[in-house]
């Protein structure tokens, strides 16, 4: 092989990623077969989980789909999981894939309405503490009845629009068609300080909203995918689910909102950044300009979007169909009644979610490895061997730790299945089963905010287009989530252990 061709292969491998990153991924790929041969499949599988988490942590160096995809492809070739096991995981999580394909695209077609509403909220509320509290509370309320990924997609769409508006003005590219908000090369030094402050401002709002989706999502039957699973196994309907979980979810919700206020007041952990006056002026002028340009056709489109949002909320609340199918309904309604019929224009709506959908398939391959190698089985057995009064608290901790590194739907599935089998075998009372079901639900929802891979909404935020724009890395997300993790995890454990 010629030297120029070798260099070309080296440069093409993982694109513009740093050289050390490329070498690290190659080292992973070369060492895994050796590790499987020397240490066995269990050790190799745990190492694979760690390697995949590394690719997520380095998401700003390289999108995790490529390095993570290579790792899971190797895992399938080495026999750590079978293609059939991966397919079974995808079938089990098909509603989540449907949601990503269609619901996120549906939200894209509602962005004009959302931008109007959120711009009025952002420009109308001067207090950053109150604004943060509203973002967190609204995200919690919406996630209790919608889906956390849907709510996160809304907030991301708004943040991207706001950032692009100011960045375009700051870089003097108001009318440029090939404008790229990802680079600051055209931003003069005069505006850079304001731009960095605006980035910090948006980062804090995004994190408050993301945590809010977890605070609200734990409360109801439809808040998170695993809630439906647990509710089905326990035989709880909507009201009964809320009542059973309330002794844990309500105190944690209150504590989470107080934490939001405390973080903004203390300006710790990356919070407390204010909206610069110059940025507020630009956004206000943009909002006023958009309002002046809004003619009858645009107003009619906003009305259609509002009606579609109403249909969306009713459909989700009544669960008339899978969430993704309701998203497809929204796409059809809005595009049909606002005149969006161009194929390329429709295609742009899917650009945000489909890369993440592909990444989630790779993530489910890791879950298949965990499942097929029984990595969590010893932990489950150890918890269920404890005295009955200690089981809820330990289940909460075990769920939280495992959900922080794996898929919380998978963790909840494993635990609730084991506990239901113990109930059916007569090893526990129905009352104790209900207590353990609440521990599993809250354990998979609350402490899992510790890492982006613990919550699908957090992972979606990390790998979305807004993350590089506002410099929101894996490490920064972990750091900013830390106070919430300690409060929600600590109080959640105490409530599960003493208040159920």
UniProtKB/Swiss-Prot annotation:
Cellular component GO terms held in the UniProt record: plasma membrane
Disulfide bridges in this chain: none
Entry keyword annotation includes Transmembrane: yes
Pfam families in the record: NhaB
Cell compartment(s), UniProt: Cell inner membrane
Protein's membrane topology: Multi-pass membrane protein
Catalytic reaction(s) noted: 2 Na(+)(in) + 3 H(+)(out) = 2 Na(+)(out) + 3 H(+)(in)
TM helices/strands, residue ranges: 28-50, 68-88, 98-118, 121-141, 145-165, 205-225, 244-264, 301-318, 350-370, 394-414, 449-469, 477-497
Main location: membrane
Keyword annotations: Antiport, Cell inner membrane, Cell membrane, Ion transport, Membrane, Sodium, Sodium transport, Transmembrane, Transmembrane helix, Transport
GO molecular function, one term: sodium:proton antiporter activity
Function: Na(+)/H(+) antiporter that extrudes sodium in exchange for external protons.
HAMAP family: NhaB (MF_01599)
Family: Belongs to the NhaB Na(+)/H(+) (TC 2.A.34) antiporter family.
Record-given protein name: Na(+)/H(+) antiporter NhaB
The species this protein was found in: Pseudomonas paraeruginosa (strain DSM 24068 / PA7)
């Amino acid at each position: 092989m010629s030297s120029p061709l070798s260099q070309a292969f080296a440069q093409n491998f993982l694109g513009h990623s740093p050289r050390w990153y490329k070498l690290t991924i190659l080292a992973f790929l070369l060492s895994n077969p050796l590790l499987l041969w020397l240490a066995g499949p269990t050790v190799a599988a745990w190492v694979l989980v760690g390697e995949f988490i590394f690719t997520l942590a380095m998401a700003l160096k390289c999108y995790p789909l490529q390095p993570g995809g290579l790792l899971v492809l190797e895992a399938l070739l080495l026999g750590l999981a079978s293609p059939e096991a991966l397919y079974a995981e995808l079938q089990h999580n098909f509603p989540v894939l449907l949601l990503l394909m269609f619901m996120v695209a549906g939200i894209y077609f509602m962005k004009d309405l959302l931008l109007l509403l959120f711009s009025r909220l952002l420009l109308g509320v001067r207090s950053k503490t109150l604004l943060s509290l509203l973002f967190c509370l609204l995200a919690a309320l919406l996630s209790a009845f919608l889906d956390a990924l849907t709510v996160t997609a809304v907030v991301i769409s708004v943040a991207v629009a706001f950032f692009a508006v100011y960045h375009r003005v700051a870089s003097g590219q108001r009318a440029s068609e090939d404008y790229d908000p990802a680079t600051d090369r055209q931003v003069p030094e005069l505006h850079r300080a304001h731009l960095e402050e605006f980035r910090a401002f948006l980062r804090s709002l995004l994190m408050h909203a993301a945590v809010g989706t977890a605070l609200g999502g734990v409360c109801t039957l439809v808040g998170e995918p695993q809630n439906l699973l647990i509710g089905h196994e326990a035989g709880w309907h909507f009201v009964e689910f809320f009542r059973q979980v309330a002794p844990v979810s309500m105190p944690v919700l209150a504590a989470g909102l107080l934490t939001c206020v405390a973080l903004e007041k203390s300006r710790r952990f990356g919070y407390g950044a204010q909206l610069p006056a110059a940025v507020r002026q630009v956004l206000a002028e943009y909002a006023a300009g958009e309002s002046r340009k809004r003619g009858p056709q645009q107003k009619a489109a906003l009305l259609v979007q509002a009606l579609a949002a109403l249909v969306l909320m009713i459909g989700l609340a009544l669960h008339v169909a899978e969430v993704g199918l309701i998203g497809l309904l929204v796409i059809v309604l809005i595009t049909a009644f606002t005149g969006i019929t161009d194929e390329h224009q429709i295609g742009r709506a899917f650009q945000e979610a489909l890369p993440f959908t592909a990444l989630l398939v790779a993530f489910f391959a890791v879950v298949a490895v965990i499942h097929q190698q029984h990595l969590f089985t010893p932990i489950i057995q150890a918890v269920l061997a404890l005295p009955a009064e200690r089981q809820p608290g330990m289940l909460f901790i075990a769920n939280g730790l495992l959900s922080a590194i794996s898929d919380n739907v998978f963790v909840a599935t494993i635990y609730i299945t084991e506990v239901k089998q113990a109930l059916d075998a007569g090893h526990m009372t129905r009352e104790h089963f209900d207590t353990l079901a609440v521990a599993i639900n809250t354990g998979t929802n609350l402490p899992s905010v510790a890492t982006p891979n613990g919550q699908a909404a957090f992972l979606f935020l990390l790998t979305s287009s807004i993350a590089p724009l506002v410099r929101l890395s894996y490490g920064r997300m972990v750091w900013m989530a830390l106070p919430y993790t300690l409060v929600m995890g600590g109080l959640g454990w105490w409530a599960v252990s003493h208040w159920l």
